[in-house]
Amino acid sequence: HCTARYGYAWVALDEPIADIPDIPEFSNPAWRTIFQFYETWATSQMRALENSFDNSHFSFVHRATFGVPDAPQPSKYELIENDTGFYAETVIAAANPEKFHRISGVQDAVTTRHMRNAYFLPFSRRLDIEYPSGVRHVIINCFTPIDDGSMQLCQWLFRNDTEEDCPAQM
């Protein structure tokens, strides 16, 4: 089974267990699409997905970017299971060094990220990050198993600002 959608071929070797996730931003002219990367990772798709939803790692793994080392306690997720997987929502503190001001649209040294995270069966995720400025940064991850020890990660994102506001190559 192969379907062309969102600029990619979506393949299921057997009958698909779920539909391809709906990504409304893809066809909405108010959003710009940025294809970020397509990489092979030496891990399983379930481990990568688990990490995607683990907000306790931000202060440690992302300390050079948005992690706040002085606030290592993870924020509480509100989790809702649904027919396509689950939806999890939280608000976190995020470091916002000057080099990230254009990404967040915020000038403060520490800001917040309202994170709306969704898991779609079997191996996809959507992370909608909203900053206090109203800037939204929606990340799509698709994790494709290759073998028992590796997977292919495809990531692209959507932003509701302009290239002049925040260049895609930042």
Placement of each model-derived feature along the sequence:
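Active-site-proximal cofactor/substrate-binding loop regions of enzyme domains
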Residues: 1-10
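Short, acidic, small-residue-rich periplasmic hinge/interaction motif at the N-terminus
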Residues: 12-16
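C-terminal catalytic domain of Rieske-type non-heme iron oxygenases
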Residues: 17-170
